[in-house]
C-alpha cells in the first residue's frame, strides 16, 4: 500500500511546483508589459511635446513673416513718397533753370561758342555806328545767379558784316572814317580791335512778332570776348579787374562771326578724333543722326607701333 501512496505524493509535489512556476511567469510578463507600456507612453509624450514645439516655432515664424510684410509695405510707401519728392524737386529745378535763362531769350538766334547748335543762318544787317549808342547788349542780362559751369565760353553773332570787317582791316569803322579804340591786345598776334553794330532778330515765336535788336559786336581776341576759365572754375580770379577775360555773362561781349560759322560739321569730330581747338573751333562739334551714322562708318585709326 505504501508503494501506491508514494507516487501520489510525488505527483502532488510536482503539481505544486508547476503552479508556483506559472505564477512567477505571469508576474514577469506583467512587469515587461508594464515597462513596454510605460516606454510607449513616454515616446508618445515626447512626440506630443515635439509637435507642440513645432507649432510654437511655426507660429513665431508666421508672426515674423507678418512683421516683415508690414515693414516691406512701409518701405514701399516711403520709397514712393521719396520718389515723388525727388520728381517734384527735379521739376522745380528745371523750372528755375528755365526762369533763370529767360533773359537770354533775346539771343536765341545767336550762336553760343560753348554750345554747338545747328541753326539757320542769321541774316543780320550792319549799320553805321554813329546812328546808335554805345550801350552793350549784355546789359539786359540782369540775372547773376546762373551756374558758372553752364555759362557759354563766348557769344557769337553770325553776320554778313564779318567779310566787310575782315577786308581793309577796319570794317564799318574804316568805312565811316571814325575808327574807335583801335587797340592791339597783347598776345593776339596784333589783331586790330574794332567794333560795329549789327541787328539780330529777337526771341519772338512768330515772324511778324520778332523785333530786331541792336547788338554791338567785337572781333575775336578782343578783351572780354571770352569767359575766364579760372573764374568759371573757382569763382575768383587773381587778376581781378585787370583780367582780359569776362567774369560773368554781363561782361561777356558778343563776337562777330562769319555767316557760315558753326554751320558745317568738324571733320575731326566726324572722323571720331578729338578736335584740338575745343570750343574755339569754327565748325560744329554736335552731330545729327545722319552724321552720327556717317561717323560710325569710320574705322578707328589703329596706332602704329615701331618694332625695334
Curated annotation (Swiss-Prot):
Gene Ontology annotations for the cellular component aspect, listed alphabetically: cytoplasm; nucleus
Phenotype when the gene is knocked out: No visible phenotype under normal growth conditions. The double mutants c3h14 and c3h15 have reductions in stem secondary cell wall thickening and defects in anther development. Callose deposition defects in microspores, and pollen exine formation severely affected, leading to male sterility.
GO process terms (BP): brassinosteroid mediated signaling pathway; regulation of DNA-templated transcription
Role noted for this protein: Functions probably as a transcriptional factor that activates genes involved in secondary cell wall biosynthesis. Functions redudantly with C3H14 to regulate secondary cell wall formation. C3H14 and C3H15 have overlapping roles in the regulation of secondary cell wall formation and anther development. C3H14 may contribute more to secondary cell wall thickening while C3H15 could be more important in anther development.
Tissue specificity comment: Highly expressed in secondary cell wall-forming tissues and the xylem cells of roots. Expressed predominantly in inflorescence stems, flowers and siliques. Highly expressed in the basal portion of stems, where cells are undergoing secondary cell wall thickening. Highly expressed in meiocytes and tapetum from anthers.
Keyword Aminoacyl-tRNA synthetase in record: no
Name of the protein in its database record: Zinc finger CCCH domain-containing protein 15
Tagged with keyword Cytoplasm: yes
PANTHER family (alphabetical): CCCH ZINC FINGER/TIS11-RELATED, ZINC FINGER CCCH DOMAIN-CONTAINING PROTEIN 15
Further information: Plants overexpressing C3H15 exhibit small and slightly curled leaves, and retarded stem elongations due to cell elongation defect and ectopic secondary cell wall formation. Overexpression of C3H15 results in secondary cell wall thickening in fibers and vessels.
Compositional bias annotation for Polar residues: 148-164
Residues annotated with Phosphoserine modification: 111
UniProt GO molecular function: DNA-binding transcription factor activity; mRNA binding; transcription cis-regulatory region binding; zinc ion binding
Annotated spans, Disordered: 1-21, 110-190
PTM section of the record: Phosphorylated at Ser-111 by ASK7/BIN2 in the cytoplasm in the absence of brassinosteroids (BRs).
Coiled coil: 56-91
Residue ranges, compositional bias (Low complexity): 9-21
Keywords: Brassinosteroid signaling pathway, Coiled coil, Cytoplasm, DNA-binding, Metal-binding, Nucleus, Phosphoprotein, Repeat, Transcription, Transcription regulation, Zinc, Zinc-finger
Zinc fingers (C3H1-type) by residue: 222-250, 260-288
Annotated localization: Cytoplasm; Nucleus
A Pfam family per the record: zf-CCCH
Predominant subcellular localization, coarse grouping: cytoplasm
Organism of this sequence: Arabidopsis thaliana (Mouse-ear cress)
Stored SMART domains: ZnF_C3H1
Amino acid at each position: 500500500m505504501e508503494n501506491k501512496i508514494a507516487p501520489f505524493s510525488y505527483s502532488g509535489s510536482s503539481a505544486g511546483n508547476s503552479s508556483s512556476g506559472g505564477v512567477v511567469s505571469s508576474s514577469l510578463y506583467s512587469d515587461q508589459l508594464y515597462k513596454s507600456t510605460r516606454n510607449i507612453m513616454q515616446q508618445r509624450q515626447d512626440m506630443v511635446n515635439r509637435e507642440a514645439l513645432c507649432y510654437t516655432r511655426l507660429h513665431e515664424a508666421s508672426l515674423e513673416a507678418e512683421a516683415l510684410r508690414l515693414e516691406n509695405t512701409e518701405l514701399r510707401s516711403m520709397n514712393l513718397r521719396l520718389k515723388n519728392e525727388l520728381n517734384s524737386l527735379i521739376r522745380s529745378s528745371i523750372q528755375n533753370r528755365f526762369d533763370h535763362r529767360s533773359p537770354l531769350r533775346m539771343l536765341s538766334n545767336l550762336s553760343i561758342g560753348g554750345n554747338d547748335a545747328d541753326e539757320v543762318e542769321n541774316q543780320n544787317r550792319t549799320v553805321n555806328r554813329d546812328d546808335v549808342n554805345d550801350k552793350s547788349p549784355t546789359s539786359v542780362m540782369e540775372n547773376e545767379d546762373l551756374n558758372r559751369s553752364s555759362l557759354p565760353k563766348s557769344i557769337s553773332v553770325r553776320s554778313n558784316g564779318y567779310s566787310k570787317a575782315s577786308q581793309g582791316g577796319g570794317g564799318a569803322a574804316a568805312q565811316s572814317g571814325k575808327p574807335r579804340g583801335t587797340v592791339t591786345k597783347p598776345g593776339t598776334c596784333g589783331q586790330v580791335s574794332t567794333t560795329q553794330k549789327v541787328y539780330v532778330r529777337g526771341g519772338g515765336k512768330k515772324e511778324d512778332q520778332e523785333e530786331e535788336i541792336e547788338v554791338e559786336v567785337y572781333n575775336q581776341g578782343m578783351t572780354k570776348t571770352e569767359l575766364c576759365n579760372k573764374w568759371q572754375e573757382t569763382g575768383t580770379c587773381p587778376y581781378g579787374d585787370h583780367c582780359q577775360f569776362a567774369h560773368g555773362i554781363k561782361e561777356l561781349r558778343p563776337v562777330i562771326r562769319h555767316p557760315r560759322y558753326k554751320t558745317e560739321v568738324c571733320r575731326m569730330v566726324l572722323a571720331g578724333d578729338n578736335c584740338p581747338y575745343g570750343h574755339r573751333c569754327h565748325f560744329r562739334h554736335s552731330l545729327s543722326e545722319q552724321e552720327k551714322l556717317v561717323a560710325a562708318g569710320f574705322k578707328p585709326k589703329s596706332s602704329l607701333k615701331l618694332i625695334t
